Amino acid sequence: MEWHEIENDADLARLNELYGYFEDSFIVRMEYLSGDYVDSDLCGHMEQTNDLRVTFQRLDREPFSIELWFSHTKRISLFFANPQDKRLSDILFAKVCRNDSAFFWTLWEEFDPYNPEHLEGTALIEACGLKWRIAES
């Protein structure tokens, strides 16, 4: 499937509406690639691309699954449910939004990307770039 680069607020609105603000969805996979590596001469290379790819599935077929690709990820703050926590892991609401310097995926409906206080204590992903695609199910 084709990747769609988020370039403006209309692109963000389209993604949020297409995926129903992530209602009744689950994070089913996350893959983090730092870009750093050690070569065969044992020399370390620090590319620091910090790419994070997150795959979601939801209780709907139109579309069923999407993948978000966060480039140059700055922050990941998520809470994962464990069976002993007796909490649900489904997402009731989430959105993608942005400010002048970053893109955000957050569970907080009232999240204001321009308010620095909103960056603390809430579940979110913050990155310099964002693209998405409908994922193969």
Q: Language-model features: where?
A:
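Surface-exposed, interaction-prone regions used to assemble/regulate multi-protein complexes
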Residues: 1-137
